[in-house]
């Protein structure tokens, strides 16, 4: 049974199956989860270690170095990077792409658990797998109030809002940041203690002894078993004040007689501010497979209902919403399909002048989209910026398939005077099956090498390539088997005749004259090719290079750092001016600030932090980069003491997943690490003068943890007073920090009781008062601290950064007004210049530039592999070598036009644009296959020279129709009419549009000439 008979016999089954799959696809679309990015397992683990308060150098020796050594021994661990500060360490462990990260995380946790016994007492750690949905929330809110305390706001967030939201299916975690935690502060009067002959330890022990709640046994009576409790727990301020102590000379004394007992809050060295007011931040995280859009809707609905039950004095503000990007991507696909279909339909209507023929194309393309969605659903994928972008970018290719089939059917079955045109429809489809199969394979085969692309590029773009490959396969099947059945059923060929059988139109006549001239004067071929390549080369020189496409996310992060050692309070004062600038910008909708903390949970000092700024609707403002520049310039001019950088959150987030997020990262290493800080300062000053480097964003990588005051006890003097160094240290601690001696159960959890000793002077202690702190000896003698110790100023010790056990310093900078590639090249030239780096100091570049270089090398490999795959396919199709070489040559030459398109539109050559280059190779080959297949068919009935000419004329209309339709279908994506939803795929669309426009004359003019040159000399002239 041949193709025609088989399709004829199963036409009803084919129709029902296609319609059923399309309907199932509609239901799949309704059930598909939505997200910003696909679920990607980044091969990176973060370990946060807290060992109390200790100098950075001691933390390195006691904690960081041994832990690094243990982690480096984990199987498959590639890199171990660490940052060590006072009592804190942050370590990153990198693994190869494709590693089972659940097992890798277990390996890290196992190594850490084995290390804990050998670490300083009290050391705690947390192991975090670097996943976007773990590191960053999809939605964030702030609670503020002018009358409700921060303690009550935190309780509201922790004990009411968080549990409510955790009840929503798909929510993995709800975190809070900011607010105050209640504690009771016992301030002891040193004079009263001396008068009653008591010590701080006496008071602490009495409080602890008075707060007991423990089981003391069981009692059986009356056939029942009772559990016995000793319940002498404290209940509040009154019960604490009434605690009694026994004295030798004064009998029993109440705690209230020794000082004051008041409500207080746990000290914290970070701030969270929303719209300039102290706030409690609520961050909502989703499970990896959850539908972020429906989650956000439910979260918003539940919070709106909850806030109706709260006092009006409490305000809830949403300052981050990731689903806005998803909505924009969905809108981009919808607009792409609708606009693309309408424009492509107009193209079909213009050339064929038949509404029903146009309707066939308008039906097949949406069916291909819905069935593709069904396949994605079955594969467990989600709608995200990659899969949605793949659907939007594939619209032009889907239209291309059905257009050439409809044109073939129209040309064969629309012949005037044909007795049985309906019977010719399937015959025409059968004739076209081989070129259609070859052309479809030419496009599909380029996606095979992309499956082997590694790194962050492969992780993201494999979803886009898989989506497009599935769409093209579905489109091929619908075009080959369903479109002919629709065409035969819907088009009345007895009443309608193909316009191509009428008098040749102006386009065909023009093409014929150009083709005749090219065939007669083949010398114009190399001239034209060289001219095209020359223009492409010039465009390439003027086209910048980048990593990922620039995308307006609707908000950005303002990372800041005041001078090292600046107190939290002073940093807050300086940032008030920055907040005022942001608040007064008319394009800002909301903002939230963290000082001493960060969005991604990174290691931060009290003089560091970030501000997330959410902008108003994109339709009511300039693009985000102009707004960022406005704020940057204003802060630079008005707040000179603040070092800062701006970046968009998701871009910054992706950078954190694979390394440093900054575009320029210079890793400096030296045989003598002591010279690194000075070298880093010099390098930072030098790169600040490079065009493209934002001077305000340059960070020398030297991050002092703030100055310190060391209490150095004279052991001999302490011994003479009957004390040890630890005794002196403890009493100083009682003045400064105090000690939490016990906890009692309050209304909303445990409440700590902190015991402190009031300083001799009222208010906060000053540096010059420390040496006069009264120290009490065991014999009752009181003397100033300076009698047994001296207070020494210690300049701030920088954080210590290491990579694979080697100390480094990382100088970073943001790029502005210039592309990343040329800026990094300028940095390299500077660093390679003699005298910039002293002998023994080496450097490597990291950050986004490193990722860009890795991605470009990978894409070059993909392009080469795709070219080889195309040649192999063409060899199977034609079983000769010259034709594949000519076809691939025309496609490669068309790729040069991509640089022209990027230059004209001002878009950088990034990974998405390079993806478009690879696709041009396939699309160009597809167009060439249409021509060569027609040429080979005509060679059976006419001389080859004549067949070259006639095949080009015959394929003019279908190729022109497909090119025009594809350009128009991709135009909304290339123009980014939907804003951020289009911007990720905009370079790809521009690359394809530029490439296929040039490929049109390459196939219809250059290729006939090139093939003609391979003919025997006797056949070259017709």
Regions found by a protein language model. Give the residues of each.
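Interfacial helix-loop-helix hairpins and adjacent transmembrane helices
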Residues: 1-15, 415-427, 456, 462, ...
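Signature of alpha-helical transmembrane segments and their immediate interfacial
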Residues: 1-34, 430-432, 499-548, 629, ...
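Solvent-exposed, membrane-proximal periplasmic/extracellular interface segments of envelope transport
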Residues: 3, 8, 58-130, 191-212, ...
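Extracytoplasmic/periplasmic membrane-proximal domains and adjacent transmembrane bundles
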Residues: 6, 48, 116, 164-342, ...
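Transmembrane helices with small-residue packing motifs
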Residues: 12, 20-58, 113-123, 377-381, ...
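Hydrophobic transmembrane alpha-helices and their membrane-interface caps
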Residues: 25-30, 342-350, 354-411, 470, ...
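Helix-loop junctions and hydrophobic alpha-helical segments within the transmembrane domains
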Residues: 319, 326, 330, 392, ...
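Transmembrane alpha-helices and their membrane-interface boundaries in multi-pass membrane transporters
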Residues: 394-409, 433-452, 459-499, 611, ...
